[in-house]
């Protein structure tokens, strides 16, 4: 996930900036606010629970900021296999859209995720990539 010494695959601002959400691995929140929000959504196991918490905070008038000067290191360098991550991201995104967005937005998210999975299953067959084939075949069933 890291490129070079400190450049993330996803864009990271160079200055303090208001953002939609931050990774749970680097999330700092006051205990009172966390309690007011009733913690993480127990339906979302991993990978989207941080985004969902920040979204609920925003709906209550609280903002999320990214501080690039703060460096945190994840001791174990990961939370599971790539397949585990992909499947839980799919589940989490769909739960987020079902809970917070309109039915049309949920269906659009579902269509986009299924389309991506179908394309990657086909690609996995074409290039004989067992990981793509197995992972995204499972994702199609979500």
Task: Label each PLM-derived region with a short phrase.
Residues 1-2, 55-56, 74-75, 92-95, ...:
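Short, surface-exposed, polar/charged, turn-prone segments marking secondary-structure boundaries
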Residues 1-9, 102, 121:
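Active-site/binding-pocket entry motifs
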Residues 3-26, 127-142:
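Short linear elements at protein peripheries
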Residues 12-15, 20-71:
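A short, conserved alpha-helix in the catalytic core of glycosyltransferases
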Residues 12-15, 75, 79, 101:
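A short, mixed-charge helix-start or loop-turn motif at secondary-structure junctions
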Residues 59, 66, 70-92:
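Nucleotide-sugar-dependent glycosyltransferase catalytic core
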Residues 83-98, 103-142:
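Non-catalytic, C-terminal membrane-associated alpha-helical segments of glycosyltransferases
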């Amino acid at each position: 996930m890291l490129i070079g010494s400190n450049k993330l695959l996803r864009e990271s601002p160079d200055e303090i900036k208001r953002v939609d959400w931050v990774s749970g691995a680097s999330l700092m929140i006051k205990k009172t606010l966390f309690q007011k929000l009733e913690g993480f959504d127990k339906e979302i196991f991993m990978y989207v629970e941080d985004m969902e918490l920040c979204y609920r905070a925003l709906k209550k008038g609280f903002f999320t900021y990214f501080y690039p000067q703060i460096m945190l290191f994840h001791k174990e360098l990961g939370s599971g296999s790539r397949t585990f991550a992909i499947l839980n991201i799919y589940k989490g995104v769909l739960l987020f859209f079902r809970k917070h967005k309109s039915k049309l937005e949920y269906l659009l998210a579902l269509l986009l995720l299924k389309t991506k999975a179908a394309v990657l299953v086909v690609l996995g067959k074409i290039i004989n990539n067992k990981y793509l084939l197995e992972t995204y075949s499972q994702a199609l069933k979500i």
